[in-house]
Amino acid sequence: MMKVLVVVALLVTLISYSSSEGIDDLEADELLSLMANEQTRKECIPKHHECTSNKHGCCRGNFFKYKCRCTTVVTQDGEQTERCFCGTPPHHKAAELVVGFGKKIFG
């Protein structure tokens, strides 16, 4: 009976030690993830700014992430170039309008 108690105590000690290391690793991973998100947030492209070179780098708006919208521009030389900017798509604008209107009505 004594051997069983010793083995159980040993197992409990090993499990608690390994879980505490796992929690420390998890906290370190979360910290790295938060730091990466903060770095991404600093590097995102604001609304109405050019996103031609980074079409997936637009920032988040109030409810949705801005989308990179592109247009073809013809220069005075007759060359066509693509210019892109971060903006809110029409269906997102409509959703934001409805939510804003709902907040005004219901509080």
From Swiss-Prot:
Disulphide bond pairs: 44-59, 51-68, 58-86, 70-84
Single Gene Ontology MF annotation: toxin activity
Pro-peptide region(s): 21-41
Subcellular location: Secreted
GO CC, one annotated term: extracellular region
Keywords: Disulfide bond, Knottin, Secreted, Signal, Toxin
Keyword Signal: yes
Pfam family, one: Toxin_35
Superkingdom of the source species: Eukaryota
Family membership noted in the UniProt record: Belongs to the neurotoxin 19 (CSTX) family. 04 (U1-Lctx) subfamily.
Comment on protein domains: The presence of a 'disulfide through disulfide knot' structurally defines this protein as a knottin.
Protein name, per record: U1-lycotoxin-Ls1a
